[in-house]
């Protein structure tokens, strides 16, 4: 059984290290220090020992020694021993690796500490350098300040020195001027005294010289008067005695007077003739009649106007069907009147503003092949006393037209008011009488067309001179839609398709949009619809990309509707009937 514990074995076996000794008992050392009562007796130590286990172990060892598997058991024990040794060696290697890792960690920590130390030293050096630089800068700034203070002190001293020198120089100059003034005063005083003394001594001689000069001057004037009188008397005597010279002189003066007055009157007559034939009266604002000056300024336009053919009277004019038929009859009758050289009829066109009265008057003149002239009633009152003469000039000028003239008086109620009830000036009353005098009979030279928003204010004599009354009412739904389409095409679509202007139109249903606009613009006139189309064009031009969108059109329509409502509110406030809650006069809104 000795081989089991590795004591007696063959060579080469059991070469492992001896088993470690069991640790000493805590009470083994220093046991003498304890008391006698603490040390157990040998009898007590082995009294509870059970030898059964040792017996079983000895028995197992004997069986194993006599067993045939003893070698395998020994090999197994050796392998276990080798395994334990390998485990001990691996633990030793791990311990060595841990030691090496600890050393490397120490080296890393030392390197990190060294790096931190170097960084701190570098920072300290930088801080020290910055502090030294700061001190150097402060020293330099202090030097600059000291130098600046020194320079300022030197400059102040120099200025004080200059001021002192200037004060000394000024005092010197003043003293010099004072002395010079004193010397000058003394010299003048001496000269005055000397001159006074000389005058006193030469007083008799001076008086004699003055007396001689006055006598000589008097003698010269008397001789000049005698000579001039003698010459004039002899000349007049010679002229009177010669009757041929007298007759020639009288005839010459007479002819000169006759020539001056004749030239003056002839010039006045020629001027009035030229003004009546070639010029344009001051009351006429616009006319299609061609003048010599206009022909010289615009020959191409004048030639085109001369060769132009009569146009349709309702081209570009949108009216209701009944009104369109009536005005077309008036246009046809006017054209036939011109062809037959008959008498023209006077027409009154009344209705709200912006319904096409002026436009139809122009188209009527072009359709009939006549010239047109437009005058405003508001221009008559400011002329005062010249109004009568200006009114006669207008009718004289209209009577000289070879093609016939359509005289359109816009805002005629401004000066054709009732003479009995209205308070008008004497000059305006005289102008009205002149107008009534010139329109008392029908004429084959001109046709009178009056336009008014308040026809009830006309004088009764004016109503008596009117042959045809036409009411231009506000456009209805169909007329508004036609107007919207026409102006949308004129101011939006045509500029966008021509490509010459910065205007584009977004993609949407134009016809549907025009119908919606016509529905929203109820109560608006044709002029307001045209202004709305112009506002669309302006909004497209003012946008960033130059594109007119449907939203932009809707916004402008809403603004136009609000403005129209505000105008109607103002109209109700301005009308006298608003105090009694009565509606405005029908001529201001519709027919």
From Swiss-Prot:
Residue sites binding ATP per the record: 351-358
Residue segments, region Required for interaction with the inner surface of the mitochondrial outer membrane: 2-49
EC number(s) recorded for this UniProt protein: 3.6.1.-
Residue numbers carrying N6-succinyllysine: 490
Main location: mitochondrion
Alphabetic keyword roster: Acetylation, ATP-binding, Coiled coil, Hydrolase, Membrane, Mitochondrion, Mitochondrion inner membrane, Mitochondrion nucleoid, Nucleotide-binding, Transmembrane, Transmembrane helix
Ranges in the topological domain labelled Mitochondrial matrix: 264-586
Chain positions with N6-acetyllysine modification: 490, 494, 512
Membrane-spanning ranges: 246-263
Coiled coil segments of this chain: 55-216
Region feature (S100B-binding): 289-304
UniProt name for this protein: ATPase family AAA domain-containing protein 3A
Underlying gene: Atad3a
């Amino acid at each position: 059984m000795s081989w089991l514990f590795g004591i007696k074995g063959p060579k080469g076996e059991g070469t492992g290290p001896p088993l470690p000794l069991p640790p000493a008992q805590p009470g083994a050392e220093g046991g003498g220090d304890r008391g006698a009562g603490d040390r157990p007796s040998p009898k007590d130590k082995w009294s509870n020992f059970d030898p059964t286990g040792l017996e079983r172990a000895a028995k197992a060892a004997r069986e194993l020694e006599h067993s045939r598997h003893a070698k395998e058991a020994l090999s197994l024990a050796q392998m276990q021993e080798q395994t334990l040794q390998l485990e001990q060696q691996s633990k030793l290697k791990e311990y060595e690796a841990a030691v090496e890792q600890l050393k490397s960690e120490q080296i890393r920590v030392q390197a990190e500490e060294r790096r931190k130390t170097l960084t701190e030293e570098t920072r300290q050096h930088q801080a020290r350098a910055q502090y030294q630089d700061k001190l150097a800068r402060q020293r330099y700034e202090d030097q600059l300040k000291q130098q600046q203070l020194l320079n300022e002190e030197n400059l102040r001293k120099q200025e004080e020195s200059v001021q002192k020198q200037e004060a000394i120089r000024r005092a010197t100059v003043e003293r010099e001027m004072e002395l010079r003034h004193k010397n000058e005063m003394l010299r003048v005083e001496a000269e005055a005294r000397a001159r006074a003394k000389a005058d006193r001594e030469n007083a008799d001689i001076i008086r004699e010289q003055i007396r001689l000069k006055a006598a000589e001057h008097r003698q010269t004037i008397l001789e000049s008067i005698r000579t001039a009188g003698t010459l004039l008397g002899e000349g007049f005597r010679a002229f009177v005695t010669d009757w041929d010279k007298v007759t020639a002189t009288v005839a010459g003066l007479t002819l000169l007077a006759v020539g001056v007055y004749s030239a003056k009157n002839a010039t006045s007559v020629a001027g009035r003739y030229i003004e009546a034939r070639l010029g344009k009266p001051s009351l006429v604002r616009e006319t299609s009649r061609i003048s010599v000056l206009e022909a010289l300024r615009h020959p191409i336009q004048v030639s085109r106007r001369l060769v132009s053919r009569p146009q349709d009277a309702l081209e570009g004019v949108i009216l209701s069907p009944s009104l369109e038929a009536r005005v077309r009859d008036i246009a046809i009758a006017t054209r036939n009147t011109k062809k037959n050289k008959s008498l023209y009829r006077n027409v009154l066109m009344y209705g709200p503003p912006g319904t096409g009265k002026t436009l139809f008057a122009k188209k009527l003149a072009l359709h009939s092949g006549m010239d047109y002239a437009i005058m405003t009633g508001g221009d008559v009152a400011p002329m005062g006393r010249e109004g009568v003469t200006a009114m006669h000039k207008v009718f004289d000028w209209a009577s000289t037209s070879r093609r016939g003239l359509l005289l359109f008086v816009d805002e005629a109620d401004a000066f054709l008011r009732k003479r009995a009830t209205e308070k008008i000036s004497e000059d305006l009353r005289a102008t009205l009488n002149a107008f009534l005098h010139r329109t008392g009979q029908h004429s084959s030279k001109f046709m009178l067309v009056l336009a008014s928003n308040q026809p009830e204010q006309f004088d009764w004599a004016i109503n008596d001179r009117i042959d045809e009354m036409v009411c231009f009412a506000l456009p209805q739904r169909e007329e508004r839609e036609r107007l919207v389409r026409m102006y949308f095409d004129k101011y939006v679509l045509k500029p966008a398709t021509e490509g010459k202007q910065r205007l584009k139109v977004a993609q949407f249903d134009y016809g549907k949009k025009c119908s919606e606009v016509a529905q929203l613009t109820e109560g608006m006139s044709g002029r307001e619809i045209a202004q709305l189309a112009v506002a669309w064009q302006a909004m497209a031009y003012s946008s960033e990309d130059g594109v007119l969108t449907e939203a932009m059109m809707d916004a402008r329509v809403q603004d136009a509707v609000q403005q129209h409502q505000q105008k109607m509110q103002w109209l109700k406030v301005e009308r006298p009937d608003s105090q009694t809650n009565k509606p405005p006069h029908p001529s201001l809104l519709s027919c």
